[in-house]
Amino acid sequence: MALKPRCSLVLVVACCAPEAAWSIEPQAINVYGFDFTPTFALSESYDDNFREVEHDVESTMVTRLAPAFELKAEDRNSATRVIWEPTRYIYHSASDASNTAQRLRADSIMEFTDRHRLKLEAEARKYERTTSTAVDGINDKIESKRVGGVYTFGARSALNQIDLGASYAELRYDNADGINDDKERNTSNLTTTWYHRLGSKTRGLLEYDHTRFDYLQSNSPRSSRSDAVLAGAEWDMTAKTTGKLRVGYERKNFDQSGSDDLSNPTWQVDLAWKPRTYSTFTFLARQAMAEGDDGSDAVKATFTQVGWRHGWTERITSVAEVGMGHYVYEGQDRSDDLQDYKLGVIYEMRRWLDVELAYRHRDNDSDADNESFTRNVFQITFDVSL
């Protein structure tokens, strides 16, 4: 199973922000039968440690320009969507860190009959990372590609249902002089999940996950295969409570005898509770093995987050998140404890315009030299649609 070492909150925030009346409602344009939806986000932030380092800390103002373009087509039994997101980051006090990111994604859902469904996805990204870089002061320049699909057999209301999934991903770096060459890899994954209905709103599940990591560097100590078995349940018992729980065990076997094989309990928990239509509490917990970083063979990563999103009025919403992570770097004498806090207020100025004020604090306490840091980000964001 794959889990990013620092558990990026980009995905976590999405879990804590379900569709609601206080979000902007983009309007689509009909283009030859397709729904075309453009949006634009502009943010300005002050970041007092944008490289997340312990010494020689750099601060800067950061401007983010993020247009997005969605093209969607759907009929009775299928839907297809293509999204292009070019994003420009301008670091005003560190021009070498400024960069332009690109993301292109396509999704398709096809329902052949009530018992046969297929989901397909493909994504290509090109972006730069300013934190946890291989060389101090130089961005990691990353290119990634991924294709995947899930075939589902079984009607939605059936007693049993089976998902068969497969994916393939490539990770490459554009840094010069061989920087990050040791991290380039191809990843293939096969997943099988069996669902058994326990009630009208509850299903038990049993999942097997196999992942192969092939590093391009000859005789890489990180090339491996990972196998995980999980059991759990998912439920949508009322309009107020939804959740998914998976608990299991994971084993990672390395190709090279010089690296010790690893095993670890693993779990994924996603809970949402809505005591009111305008208020949502979320709980997220993860434990899994991530790929090695900073010279380690692998990272045993544990992360927990609690979130609260509340609409005080029809136009004003607050978002609060608290996250705690523990990371053990296998093959090194290092472990990190990360605390991550976010507080934001969103004002729906118009149907097509949201304004958000946010503050984020990250504190990493590491027992390795030069790996601890604190970081504060103050940000204002304008989200615009048609």
What does each of the following model-derived ranges do?
Residues 22-386:
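Gram-negative and organellar
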Residues 10-11, 21:
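Cleavable N-terminal signal peptides
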Residues 1-9:
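Bacterial N-terminal signal peptides that target proteins for export
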